[in-house]
Design a protein with these regions (language model features):
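Generic C-terminus detector
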Residues: 366-371, 375-424
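General beta-strand structural signal in soluble alpha/beta enzymes
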Residues: 5, 30-31, 67-68, 89-92, ...
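ATP-binding N-terminal substructure of ATP-dependent carboxylate-amine bond-forming enzymes
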Residues: 1-94
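Solvent-exposed alpha-helices and their adjacent loops that cap or buttress functional pockets
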Residues: 20-23, 37-39, 60, 90, ...
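Internal nucleotide-binding/catalytic subdomain
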Residues: 156-294
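Active-site nucleotide/adenylate-binding loops and adjacent lid/helix of ATP-dependent enzymes
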Residues: 4-5, 99-181, 211, 235-251
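Active-site "cap" helix and flanking loop/linker of ATP-utilizing ligase/carboxylase catalytic domains
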Residues: 246-268, 286-358, 369
Length: 424
């Protein structure tokens, strides 16, 4: 069968790579893909992003299964368009994707269905937002309502920082429409984890747990980013926490959406804050897999992903289980100069062959130049991912592999995995 993956990031490289390992797959197309997917022997890039053109391509190439990676096409209704054309596609509809595309929608949904989350208020008037901040004090969290590529959240440790964030979003319109409304919520403490599942409308299949590293610099300092590295499994997600997350967050979300008349199918990612006492609060929902969490998760997945996705599309996820490599997988993001502000592009990359021993180099912001060499084309450039028997071993191997990859201005964290390694 022919399969299509929509997107061009590290997550899509990992999904396409895993789908192509299925014995049932003939061709895997990636639209538009990147240099990494271009270099993979079993993947073919197609330079299409327009939804109608994607539908026509899927019909022409007899694509029997499509998997959507990023949030933007989901929020634009790519799933609705494919379904209308009678094509099988895995992902939430435009209505269901509001769980990610509108923070206010998600918060109101959680409040309505009793899903644990931080207290909040939504504002489109800057003066009212400033008054609320003064009343609440710092630390406090300011979030753009709309999609902002992981950069719409400011964890303000001071009142000044909070007021500046509101001005930047509401008054200066720095994030455009995404920041026309802001959600201001209480600051939560604890440890974060990424809880990602597959949903078929009613049944849920949990994927391996993972943990992301959001801040740009070591020791979790610097600005928030789309994610600078991740590992799987996440020791903070104990069997008790796993059961609690399914019971208190995931199942009420799937059932709540259905009660609201919106059937949810697709990947669902709950960003959880886990308190030292083991209480859960939902920080955010994403209607897709995380990036870079997908990379270590796909490295560990032993099951046929095509089979899992087909069951999800058919509404029979209760008939399958996922099998995981018991080893740890850890991925380190290599980012471009000036990321996350205005990343520099066009730098030639050496040593980034995807296939490596004990791991894989997943490409994100890369494309091939006129000479067929990979070069930087975005903020997060690569995710160097490796296996290890322990967190320490996976970390050591990933950094060994990373040492062989180079491009000008490259930046990465040197402490990915520190929480798991220092955990008592």
């Amino acid at each position: 069968m022919n399969v299509l993956v929509i997107g061009n990031g590290g997550r899509e490289h990992a999904l396409a790579w895993k789908l192509s390992q299925s014995p049932r797959v003939g061709k895997v197309f990636v639209a538009p893909g990147n240099a990494g997917t271009a270099l993979e022997p079993n993947l073919t890039n197609v330079p299409i992003t327009d939804i109608d053109v994607l539908v026509a391509f899927a019909q022409r190439e007899q694509i029997q299964l499509t998997v959507v990676g990023p949030e933007a096409p989901l929020s634009k209704g790519v799933v609705d368009a494919f379904r209308k054309a009678g094509l099988k596609i895995f992902g939430p509809t435009k209505a269901a994707a509001q769980l990610e595309s509108s923070k206010d929608f998600a918060k109101a949904f959680m409040k309505r269905h009793g899903i644990p989350t931080a207290d909040y208020e939504t504002f489109s008037d800057a003066a009212k937002a400033h008054a609320y901040i003064d009343a609440k004090g710092a630390p406090i969290v300011i979030k753009a309502d709309g999609l902002a590529a992981g950069k719409g959240v400011v964890v303000a440790m001071s009142l000044q920082e909070a007021h500046d964030a509101v001005d930047s979003m509401l008054s200066d319109n720095k994030l455009g429409d995404a920041g026309a409304r802001v959600v201001i919520e209480e600051f939560l403490t604890g440890e974060e984890a990424s809880f990602i599942v597959m949903v078929d409308g009613k049944n849920v299949l949990a994927l391996a747990s993972s943990q992301d590293h959001k801040r740009l610099k070591d020791h979790d300092e610097g600005p928030n980013t789309g994610g600078m590295g991740a590992y799987s499994p996440a020791p903070v997600v104990t069997p008790e926490i796993h059961a609690k997350a399914m019971r208190e967050v995931i199942m009420p979300t799937v059932q709540g959406m259905a009660r609201d008349g919106i059937i949810y199918t697709g990947f669902l990612y709950a960003g959880l804050m886990i308190s030292p006492e083991g209480q859960l609060k939902t920080l955010e929902f994403n209607c897709r897999m995380g990036d870079p969490e997908t990379q270590p998760i796909m490295l560990r997945l032993k099951s046929d992903l095509v089979n899992l996705v087909e069951h999800a599309v058919e509404g029979s996820l209760d008939k399958v289980e996922a099998e995981w490599d018991r080893r740890v997988a850890l991925g380190i993001v290599m980012a471009a100069a000036n990321y996350p502000d205005t990343p520099r592009t066009g730098d030639v990359i050496t040593g980034a062959t995807p296939e490596v021993e004990d791991g894989h180099v997943f490409h994100a912001g890369t494309k091939l130049n006129a000479d067929g060499q990979p070069m930087t084309s975005g903020g997060r450039v690569l995710c160097v991912t490796a296996f290890g028997e322990t967190f320490k071993a996976a970390q050591k191997r990933a950094y060994e592999l990373l040492a062989g990859v180079n491009f000008d201005g490259e930046q990465h964290r040197t402490d990915i995995g520190w929480r798991a390694i220092t955990r008592k």
